[in-house]
C-alpha cells in the first residue's frame, strides 16, 4: 500500500500525534492491568486502614474502582486491544505495510508493554489513584460490552474472592517480617515469637501445657498444717496448692497460700479447716484459648486436667455415646447429689467459651470479687467430699502461668524459680 501522507504536512503531524496517543494509551491500559489487578482487595483495605497517610489516600481512591474486578479487567483489556488494533491503521498511512508492522510491533512491545508494566508494577498504587477518575469514565464508556462479559466471568469463576492467609501462611509471613530474617522487617524477636504463639495457641490443648499429676505438689485434705508442712509449702514457692482426698488423683480443690499467713503452725490445724476453693475440671482435649477465657473470669487460675476413660454403660445408645464424646464437660460445681451428678453427665453440656449465660445465672460472678464469693468456696460441713467420676482419670494440673508460657513460648521464672536454679 502506498503512503497517503507525505512528510511535514498537517495530516502527517495529526497522524503522528494520534499514533503517539495510541501508544501511550495502550501502555497505560497495559500498566494498569498489571498494577491494579495485582492488588487484592485485602491488601487495599489494609493500606486504607493502617498504611501511611499517602497510601491511605491512594487506597481509598482505588478501592471503588477495583471492587468489581472482572468489570475493570474487561474494560482495560478492551481499551488496550482497541488502541493496539488502531495503531497499524494510522501507521499504514505514513509508511509502507512492512514498515507499519515493524514500527507498530516495536512501539507496542517497548512503550506499550515493557516500560508501562515495569513502572506500574513498582508504583501501581500511586498511578492507579491518579488515573482512577479517568478509569471510571472508561468503565462507563465500555459498559455495554464489558458488563455482559464480566457477568459471565462472575458466573464461571465466582465473584468477590478474597485471598486471605491461612494460619500457617500468616505465621510464615510474620517470621519474614522479623528483623532476624534479614529482609528489612522491623518486628523484633519477641514480637514475632508472641504473634506466632498466639496463632499456635488455638491448635494446642490442655494436655500440651499441663503439669502431670506425678510432678505436681499436692497436699492431703486431712494433713496437719504443722511447721514441717508449712516450710515445705514455703519452699515450693507456689501461690496455690491443690488439695486431694484419699488419693492424689482425686483433686477436690485448692488452697491459696496467702490464706495460710494467719495459721499458727504450732496449732497443727488440718487442711480441711482452712478455706478450700473449688477447682474446675477440664478435658485434656480442651483448647488453651477456652481455658484462658475461663481463667480470665476470675473463678480460678488453676484447673484439673482429666481424661475420659472408655467406659460406656451397656444400656447407653450409640447416639448418646457419640454425643458424650463430642461434647466438652467442665465441672465447676461440686454441690450436687450423686443423682444430680449422674443426670448432669447425660445432659448436653457447653464449652467454656459459651459460659456467659451460666455466669449470668450465677449472678455474674466474673471479675466481681465482692459478690457471690462463697460460691467458689468448697463447703465441707454441709456436703460430702467429692470424688472423681469413674469414667474420668485426672492426668495433670494446668494454671494460668502454663497457658501464658505457651503464648509467649518461653518459660516464666519468678523469684523462687531463680532461687532453685541458683542452688
UniProtKB/Swiss-Prot annotation:
Chief subcellular location equals: membrane
Q: Which stretches of this protein does UniProt put in the Extracellular compartment?
A: 1-11, 92-94, 158-423
- Glycosylated residues? 273, 322
The record's Gene3D superfamilies line, in alphabetical order, gives: CBS-domain
InterPro entries tied to this protein: ACDP, CBS_dom, CBS_dom_sf, CNNM, Ion_transp-like_CBS
What's the name of the protein?
Answer: DUF21 domain-containing protein At2g14520
Residue ranges annotated for the CNNM transmembrane domain, each copy included: 8-191
| Localization of this protein | Membrane
Question: Which key words are in the record?
Answer: CBS domain, Glycoprotein, Membrane, Repeat, Transmembrane, Transmembrane helix
Its GO CC terms? membrane
SUPFAM superfamilies assigned: CBS-domain pair (SSF54631)
The UniProt entry, under Pfam families, shows: CNNM (PF01595)
Record topological domains on the Cytoplasmic side = 33-70, 116-136
Give the membrane topology.
Multi-pass membrane protein
| Residues of the CBS domain | 210-271, 275-332, 356-415
- Listed GO biological process terms: magnesium ion homeostasis
Ranges annotated as spanning the membrane: 12-32, 71-91, 95-115, 137-157
Amino acid at each position: 500500500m502506498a503512503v497517503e501522507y507525505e512528510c511535514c504536512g498537517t495530516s502527517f503531524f495529526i497522524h503522528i500525534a494520534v499514533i503517539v496517543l495510541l501508544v501511550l494509551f495502550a501502555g497505560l491500559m497495559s500498566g494498569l492491568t498489571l498494577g491494579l489487578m495485582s492488588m487484592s482487595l485485602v491488601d487495599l483495605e489494609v493500606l486504607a486502614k493502617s498504611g501511611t497517610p499517602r497510601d491511605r489516600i491512594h487506597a481509598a481512591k482505588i478501592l471503588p474502582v477495583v471492587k468489581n474486578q472482572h468489570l475493570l479487567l474487561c474494560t482495560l483489556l478492551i481499551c488496550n486491544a482497541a488502541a493496539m488494533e488502531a495503531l497499524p491503521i494510522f501507521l499504514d498511512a505514513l509508511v509502507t505495510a512492512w514498515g507499519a508492522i515493524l514500527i507498530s510491533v516495536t512501539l507496542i512491545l517497548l512503550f506499550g508493554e515493557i516500560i508501562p508494566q515495569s513502572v506500574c508494577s513498582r508504583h501501581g498504587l500511586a498511578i492507579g489513584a491518579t488515573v482512577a477518575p479517568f478509569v471510571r469514565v472508561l468503565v462507563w464508556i465500555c459498559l455495554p460490552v464489558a458488563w455482559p462479559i464480566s457477568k459471565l466471568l462472575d458466573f464461571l469463576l465466582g465473584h468477590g474472592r478474597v485471598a486471605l492467609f491461612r494460619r500457617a501462611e500468616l505465621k510464615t509471613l510474620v517470621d519474614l517480617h522479623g528483623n532476624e530474617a534479614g529482609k528489612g522487617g522491623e518486628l523484633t524477636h519477641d514480637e514475632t515469637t508472641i504473634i506466632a504463639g498466639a496463632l499456635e495457641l488455638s491448635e494446642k490443648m490442655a494436655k500440651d501445657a499441663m503439669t502431670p499429676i506425678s510432678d505436681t505438689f499436692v497436699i492431703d485434705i486431712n494433713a496437719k498444717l504443722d511447721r514441717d508442712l508449712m516450710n515445705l509449702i514455703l519452699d515450693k514457692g507456689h501461690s496455690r496448692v491443690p488439695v486431694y482426698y484419699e488419693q492424689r488423683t482425686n483433686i477436690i480443690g485448692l488452697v491459696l497460700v496467702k490464706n495460710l499467713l494467719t495459721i499458727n503452725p504450732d496449732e497443727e490445724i488440718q487442711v480441711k479447716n482452712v478455706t478450700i476453693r473449688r477447682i474446675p475440671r477440664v478435658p485434656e482435649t480442651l483448647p488453651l484459648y477456652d481455658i484462658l477465657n475461663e481463667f480470665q473470669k476470675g473463678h480460678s487460675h488453676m484447673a484439673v486436667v482429666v481424661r475420659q476413660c472408655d467406659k460406656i454403660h451397656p444400656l447407653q445408645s450409640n447416639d448418646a455415646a457419640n454425643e458424650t464424646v463430642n461434647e466438652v464437660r467442665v465441672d465447676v460445681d461440686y454441690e450436687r447429689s450423686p443423682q444430680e451428678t449422674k443426670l448432669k453427665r447425660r445432659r448436653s453440656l457447653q464449652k467454656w467459651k459459651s459460659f456467659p449465660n451460666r455466669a449470668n445465672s450465677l449472678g455474674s460472678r466474673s471479675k466481681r470479687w465482692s459478690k457471690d464469693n462463697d460460691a467458689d468456696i468448697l463447703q465441707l460441713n454441709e456436703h460430702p467430699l467429692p470424688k472423681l467420676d469413674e469414667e474420668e482419670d485426672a492426668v495433670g494440673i494446668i494454671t494460668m502461668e502454663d497457658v501464658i508460657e505457651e503464648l509467649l513460648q518461653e518459660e516464666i521464672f519468678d523469684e523462687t524459680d531463680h532461687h532453685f536454679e541458683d542452688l
